[in-house]
Amino acid sequence: MTNKLIIFDTTLRDGEQSPGASMTKDEKIRIAKVLEKMKVDVIEAGFAIASEGDFEAVQAVANIVQNSVICSLARALDKDIDRAGEALKGANASRIHTFIATSNIHMKMKLQMTPDQVVGQAVRAVKRANRYTDNIEFSPEDAGRSDEDFLCYIIEAVIKAGATTINIPDTVGYNIPHQFGATIKSLIERIPNSDKAIFSAHCHNDLGLAVANSLSAVLNGARQVECTINGLGERAGNTSLEELVMAVRTRQDIFDCDTNIDTMHILSASRLASSVTGFIIQPNKAIVGANAFAHEAGIHQDGVLKHRETYEIMRAEDVGWNANQLVLGKHSGRNAFKVRLAKLGVEFNDDGSLNDAFRRFKELADKKHEIFDEDLQALVSETQTESCDEAIKLVSLKVCTETNEKNTATVVLFINDKKKTATANTSGAVDATFSAINSLASIKINLQLYSVSNVTQGTDALGEVNVRLEYNGRIVNGQGVDTDIITASAKAYVHGLNKVLTVTNKAHPQI
């Protein structure tokens, strides 16, 4: 009988630590709903004590999601654990994930505590978490550089205190597969009460080995893996959920376990996370990249046409890919629109949101003859993004360009419900547009990244623009879509500005 491998998704917590990837409460709820549809076992919704916004997001996800365990991170401090417990009150099933550093350098330089003091604090934290839930996870931060004898000592103590999951993090992505797998195996074998807890892996991708290290951990006894959609996360990111899940499922000849993940929702989850965070999926990204199932070489194409398994080890349709099938047109009705979006995993909270999305669909259908699923997802994502309260709204944009002449952009914005207009003349249409917006917003913004991609194929395709803005040390991403690239650019810039005005810095720890 195949053992169950628990999938612990931390896109909403660790994934959010990607530079500029801060999410609003509504964005976290949207991603959490998709994770629930995917049948993710545990959703780490945030770090409840980090900010009021984080607390509200954890609380909202806990109240809405019914079929996944909802988790909040908490340092091994009473105030953190109490805040997490309060945020999780409404959850159908909850978990508190507490942690403390265990490597010599962290204990000495960061915590300024002795090993015995660290053990005592960890035990007290687990016992306090038990006031709120009997589902308690403990992580020895920087376990990859910790002394193994000390790891055995502290893990045995926290299991005895009530920890039910032991998560071994490679916080700085330092380990390599055989080393990390051996650590997991040794801990399970050496700790007397290891059978009372599930062992978990949390790997970072600094050396490009997060998925490989996690798979090695599974082969050596770990039965939970912590991961993020698209491998999002601080620095080089975390273990990629889609890669880990499909590796285990594809190689059942090697792994004696499998996940409960409904892989049909992998692609939609990937695109949603990309849209919300502004982190574009590279074309050659395994499983979800545009080229993941493409075959250029003639010999490969011939082989696939004759028999798929000659060059494909997975079916594209099993992770949500289709053939860019034309699904709707300008004569399609509201109900057909709603039904198609439901099949794509998109739901609306009220008729007003549906009507707004349908209006935008009709506007798009007048500009673009062929409407694909990717168009619908991009359109709805923008609709839901703009449904949030915004201090700045784009009313109109007029751009005049001429070869070898400066470009002129006239922008009309609503700023705090006041209509304002500005014109700028510069060497480029995008630069002129951004300059005009900046003059109206009256804040100095540093543009760190500007990228354009097409949502589908064709000259009339929707263009998706992503910008990364920096303001007073804060980094945010903004997204915009339109059949006109300059308009999409303006939308993305305004979206980023609104995030600058609302997103606050949060003290997220590393694990």
UniProtKB/Swiss-Prot annotation:
<dbReference type="InterPro" id="IPR013785">
    <property type="entry name" value="Aldolase_TIM"/>
</dbReference>
<dbReference type="InterPro" id="IPR013709">
    <property type="entry name" value="2-isopropylmalate_synth_dimer"/>
</dbReference>
<dbReference type="InterPro" id="IPR000891">
    <property type="entry name" value="PYR_CT"/>
</dbReference>
<comment type="pathway">
    <text>Amino-acid biosynthesis; L-leucine biosynthesis; L-leucine from 3-methyl-2-oxobutanoate: step 1/4.</text>
</comment>
<feature type="binding site">
    <location>
        <position position="202"/>
    </location>
    <ligand>
        <name>Mn(2+)</name>
    </ligand>
</feature>
<keyword id="KW-0028">Amino-acid biosynthesis</keyword>
<dbReference type="GO" id="GO:0003985">
    <property type="term" value="F:acetyl-CoA C-acetyltransferase activity"/>
</dbReference>
<feature type="domain" description="Pyruvate carboxyltransferase">
    <location>
        <begin position="5"/>
        <end position="267"/>
    </location>
</feature>
<feature type="binding site">
    <location>
        <position position="14"/>
    </location>
    <ligand>
        <name>Mn(2+)</name>
    </ligand>
</feature>
<comment type="function">
    <text>Catalyzes the condensation of the acetyl group of acetyl-CoA with 3-methyl-2-oxobutanoate (2-ketoisovalerate) to form 3-carboxy-3-hydroxy-4-methylpentanoate (2-isopropylmalate).</text>
</comment>
<dbReference type="InterPro" id="IPR005671">
    <property type="entry name" value="LeuA_bact_synth"/>
</dbReference>
<keyword id="KW-0479">Metal-binding</keyword>
<dbReference type="InterPro" id="IPR054691">
    <property type="entry name" value="LeuA/HCS_post-cat"/>
</dbReference>
<dbReference type="InterPro" id="IPR050073">
    <property type="entry name" value="2-IPM_HCS-like"/>
</dbReference>
<keyword id="KW-0464">Manganese</keyword>
<dbReference type="Pfam" id="PF22617">
    <property type="entry name" value="HCS_D2"/>
</dbReference>
<comment type="subunit">
    <text>Homodimer.</text>
</comment>
<keyword id="KW-0100">Branched-chain amino acid biosynthesis</keyword>
<dbReference type="GO" id="GO:0003852">
    <property type="term" value="F:2-isopropylmalate synthase activity"/>
</dbReference>
<dbReference type="GO" id="GO:0030145">
    <property type="term" value="F:manganese ion binding"/>
</dbReference>
<feature type="binding site">
    <location>
        <position position="238"/>
    </location>
    <ligand>
        <name>Mn(2+)</name>
    </ligand>
</feature>
<feature type="region of interest" description="Regulatory domain">
    <location>
        <begin position="393"/>
        <end position="511"/>
    </location>
</feature>
<keyword id="KW-0963">Cytoplasm</keyword>
<comment type="similarity">
    <text>Belongs to the alpha-IPM synthase/homocitrate synthase family. LeuA type 1 subfamily.</text>
</comment>
<dbReference type="InterPro" id="IPR002034">
    <property type="entry name" value="AIPM/Hcit_synth_CS"/>
</dbReference>
<protein>
    <recommendedName>
        <fullName>2-isopropylmalate synthase</fullName>
        <ecNumber>2.3.3.13</ecNumber>
    </recommendedName>
</protein>
<dbReference type="InterPro" id="IPR036230">
    <property type="entry name" value="LeuA_allosteric_dom_sf"/>
</dbReference>
<dbReference type="GO" id="GO:0009098">
    <property type="term" value="P:L-leucine biosynthetic process"/>
</dbReference>
<dbReference type="Pfam" id="PF00682">
    <property type="entry name" value="HMGL-like"/>
</dbReference>
<dbReference type="GO" id="GO:0005829">
    <property type="term" value="C:cytosol"/>
</dbReference>
<dbReference type="Pfam" id="PF08502">
    <property type="entry name" value="LeuA_dimer"/>
</dbReference>
<keyword id="KW-0432">Leucine biosynthesis</keyword>
<keyword id="KW-0808">Transferase</keyword>
<feature type="binding site">
    <location>
        <position position="204"/>
    </location>
    <ligand>
        <name>Mn(2+)</name>
    </ligand>
</feature>
